[in-house]
From Swiss-Prot:
Cited PANTHER family: HYPOXANTHINE PHOSPHORIBOSYLTRANSFERASE (PTHR43340:SF1), HYPOXANTHINE-GUANINE PHOSPHORIBOSYLTRANSFERASE (PTHR43340)
Protein EC: 2.4.2.8
Protein known as: Hypoxanthine-guanine phosphoribosyltransferase
Pfam families, per database record: Pribosyltran (PF00156)
GO biological process, one term: guanine salvage
Active-site residues annotated for this sequence: D100 (proton acceptor)
Reactions mediated catalytically: IMP + diphosphate = hypoxanthine + 5-phospho-alpha-D-ribose 1-diphosphate; GMP + diphosphate = guanine + 5-phospho-alpha-D-ribose 1-diphosphate
Primary gene name: hpt
Organism this protein belongs to: Mycoplasma genitalium (strain ATCC 33530 / DSM 19775 / NCTC 10195 / G37)
Length: 175
């Protein structure tokens, strides 16, 4: 499969997701929030946390394309699916699978700012430990990991491996 090693196992994912739920429930207590999942990678993470959120929410999605069938970001990211709710004067909770360079999520945050969102909060399953190309404030991350190419639990290589119940280091030359 090309998986060199597992860096976050199933039990760790469960624990990290519960910590994210606790943090969000405390932050958004008695608020109405648009939970904005960034497709496609957010699906497993969002699925684990959304049913445990205790605040009022509307669910929405955006899709940002940046890798285009490789593990190297070759082109500037672009919005390929926009959200359906109007973010104006709303609290937005962004759900992201991974923050790597910050390019893709910065595009989303900048767009939400131009649309006059009341507040923008970013939680991510994974944050890579490396300098970000852009100044991004990650309000909560479940895991901070070294700069490897990762797959599993929403993270993919050319659309594959998202369904793995863990996160692993991927090497294309390691079948």
């Amino acid at each position: 499969m090309g998986i060199k090693s597992i860096v976050i196992n199933e039990q760790q994912i469960e624990e990290g997701c519960q910590k994210a739920v606790n943090w969000c429930n405390a932050k958004f207590n008695n608020k109405k929030v648009i939970v904005l999942g960034i497709l496609k990678g957010c699906i497993p993470f969002l699925g684990k946390v959304i049913s445990k959120f205790s605040f009022d929410l509307q669910l929405d999605f955006m899709a940002v394309a940046s890798y285009h069938g490789s593990h190297v970001q070759k082109q500037p990211p672009k919005i390929v699916l926009d959200m359906s709710h109007d973010p104006k004067d709303k609290d937005i909770l962004l759900i992201e699978d991974i923050v790597d360079s910050g390019r893709s999520i910065k595009l989303v945050i900048d767009l939400l700012k131009t649309r006059h969102a009341k507040s923008i909060t970013l939680i991510s399953l994974i944050e890579k430990i490396k300098p970000k190309a852009f100044d991004i404030n990650i309000d909560f991350s479940c895991f901070k990991v070294k700069d490897n190419f990762l797959v599993g639990f929403g993270l993919d290589y050319d659309g594959f491996y998202r369904n793995l119940p863990y996160v692993g280091v991927f090497e294309p030359d390691n079948p």
